[in-house]
């Protein structure tokens, strides 16, 4: 690691913080559960995106940019997507309606995370592009005696796995209804879960040995992580709410299909996000999307920069719960305002910040050390370069080239959404996006593709 402090991570699987030892230092592999693209991402979704972006940056710094593979999936087949498609596009055939929902939502997600200063993952597979891999794993589970067919569904037999429940530490006999576990009469055991279910004529489906159907939620991540990272990989991340049943069931499927002792060596989970001391929910009226926070005045009567949201998240340790509030955002904004605008050059990150990050991503201590460094950076160019290199590692001060890339990605995403709005004849929303970009100095030019005749939009920064 060449002078870099020893990296220690808390492992949910062992309930211990231990030294991280990658399977292959030349190819460190990390998988993080990404969005289900039926609705815009909310600030709770922003937390794992930011947390694991910091870890991605740290791993790249320690092992080298070309020696880390970060995969974050897109779930684009789900009953919630079907319901949203029927609600929002009742006049379209379901497949077209689903495509309209998923494309718009995925595009918005990419725009949101770009504004939060996040690097793109190396791989971002969609569930619908990996159906064959899911079917292959299900066939293995049936042949290995870990799955069965009942009432047209394929289910995982939880009692066939002696140590099922090792991640959540929940004994099998305690796993009754609740925690997103459905209990049905055709199950052998209450905790058995769906690997494949039949689709009606108007639902999305794929041909399989068990009839035309679609995958269960958990099998999707098992298939995508294996395809891009292998049977066993280094780190699997996500929110605390995913420990059970999602991650527990991923482990069960993957281990029983491939005959491995583990699926991932380290399991990391970030804590919950509350809003002003209350659980975030639409019924509470405190449901805040990333887009709303950045581009509307619904939270605190103003818009907030992406860097402020990012820093506000990093001011609490990732395993602790966050009470997301206007006060917290204001505190982060005041802190950012005191930091110098400098370029990293060839400087190395600050040792105190590196020590903090190497201690299970202690971003609280890292931000404190970075702020102390900022005071001297205003008057000392060398310290300023160190400050910039360190801030870049936290993603709160991107390199100029990455600022340009992030802005371009965000603009491209908004332009794509506007085109979809124009196609749907939703001119009010399209004009709103155009006005929003104009206010930021971005000029749009509408035209037609000479070959296809389709509407195209280009953009440029007004000089």
Curated annotation (Swiss-Prot):
Cofactor(s) this protein requires: Zn(2+)
EC top class, as a word: ligase
Record EC number: 6.1.1.16
Gene Ontology molecular-function annotations: ATP binding; cysteine-tRNA ligase activity; zinc ion binding
GO BP, sorted A to Z: cysteinyl-tRNA aminoacylation
Pfam families assigned: CysS_C, tRNA-synt_1e
Binding site for Zn(2+): 33, 221, 246, 250
Ligand binding (ATP): 282
Catalytic activity: tRNA(Cys) + L-cysteine + ATP = L-cysteinyl-tRNA(Cys) + AMP + diphosphate
Motif ('KMSKS' region): 279-283
A GO cellular component entry from the record: cytosol
InterPro entries: Cys-tRNA-ligase (IPR015803), Cys-tRNA/MSH_ligase (IPR024909), CysS_C (IPR056411), Rossmann-like_a/b/a_fold (IPR014729), tRNA-synt_1_cat_dom (IPR032678), tRNAsynth_Ia_anticodon-bd (IPR009080)
Family: Belongs to the class-I aminoacyl-tRNA synthetase family.
Name assigned to this protein: Cysteine--tRNA ligase
Protein's organism: Rhizobium etli (strain CIAT 652)
Lineage of the organism: Bacteria, Pseudomonadati, Pseudomonadota, Alphaproteobacteria, Hyphomicrobiales
Gene responsible for this protein: cysS
